[in-house]
Amino acid sequence: MKKILSFALVAIMVLGLFAGCTPATTNDGDGEVTIKVAAIETAYGAEMWKKVCEAFTAQTGIKVELTTDKNLEDIIGPQIQGNNAPDVVHLATGRPAGLTEQLIKANGLHDLTNVLNMVVPGETKKVSDKIAGGFTDTSLTNPYSDGKTYMAPMFYSPCGLFYNAKLFAAKGWTVPTTWDEMWTLGEKAKAEGIALFTYPTAGYYDAFMYALMYSIGGAEFFDKATHYAEGIWDTEEAKTMFNILDKLAGYTHEKTPAQANNEDFTKNQLMVMQDEALFMPNGTWIVGEMAEAQKTLTNDFAWGMTALPAVKAGGAGYSYTWFEQAWIPAGAQNKAAAEQFVAFLYSDKAVEIFAKTEKADGNLSGAMQPVLGIADKLEGDNKLFYSIYDNGAKAAMGNFAAFNAIPDVDTSKVFFEPIDKLVAGSLTIEEYVANIKTASDLMRANLKG
């Protein structure tokens, strides 16, 4: 797992973003603008990005120099440091290298609020009229709480608890709608040698914990918790959250922590597919990510997905909506053309390309843009996953608020990564909570905005 960029390096990068970088236009000598686009290559594949860039050039005449890589930070980090930043970057938060988070903290992103008011190239609607409600009103897209949007929402994916629907049908088990029902099911599964829970890596606890906050205390508790409000971790809602996390750790497969890393996380995902564990937190990308592994299964298997259970009977279950982000570096040389490219990402043409491009392995890309009406165009597993909000679950969005850089303190290290130790038994829930309280005091004192 890559180390987070040192603060010294970040400082150098920030200087590179602003020092001597007056806007310029890159051209090929004949007046034609060329922008540099850098996109992380994930399970969605790189082919879709090539096609979107081609479609953008055909529509606008602006050429695109595309870079895709599974370790994109290794490429663009030095570029940003050397005052040669790409014009558009698709790189979400939550990556081990933490590059996007570091640039947020360093005020290294270009304001995209103007893009929302732009007409989508080749269409008549504005970008703001295409994007589904709520996606540009979160702390992910508006990290500074200043009413401005700095990151464009991309490739949304409802997150929840994934399970083997065939196993539940064979056992006659009902998917729990409350945590009490979850614990009861955990005992039944334990009696048959099946763990109740596993997780790919502790980082997957982000969407899980956000949805849990909503299910316990709604938006009010979520907002206070994610802004590190004084005394929030001593409230009854927080105590309920920590009790659930502690109890769930005891129901988690014992091999999970050792395999919860970038090399072995698929082994934890296979636990659910091979009936060694019932549930895992994940997103809709899991189907494509494990498509080849599914072909090798010897047991009956079909994907199932449910929201996190309600705390009490009759309460609401929540499914966190994860989405990736695209952004324009503050040091980009072609901001006007870059803004056109970002606007084009929400065109009907781009939406179709992202969703239905054939990858190198023969599967479809399946990247869903957060635009209105997209669920009506889906079928199969995706129809099931993206209709979760039509089946009673409520949507949870947002994340921990950005704060100024603090040595050795970030939200992943404080809230998510310690789950491995909690499951392994090397960290008690009391120690976990105490560490959160200490770190939250620092985060609150250094909040941005």
Model regions: which residues?
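Conserved N-terminal structural module of periplasmic/extracytoplasmic solute-binding proteins
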Residues: 6, 19-106, 122-128, 175, ...
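C-terminal capping/gating helix-and-loop segments adjacent to ligand/active sites or protein-protein/ligand interfaces
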Residues: 144, 319-320, 381-444
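Extracytoplasmic/periplasmic solute-binding protein
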Residues: 140-154, 159, 183-231, 268, ...
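Hinge/lid segment of periplasmic solute-binding proteins
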Residues: 96-159, 183, 302, 306
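Short, solvent-exposed loop/beta-turn-alpha elements that line the ligand-binding surface or hinge
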Residues: 111-133, 217-240, 294-298, 310-316, ...
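Glycine-centered hinge/linker elements that transmit conformational signals in sensory
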Residues: 188-189, 227-260
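Extracytoplasmic/periplasmic substrate-recognition and gating elements
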Residues: 54, 58, 63, 81-82, ...
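Mature extracytoplasmic/periplasmic domains
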Residues: 111, 285-294, 308, 312, ...
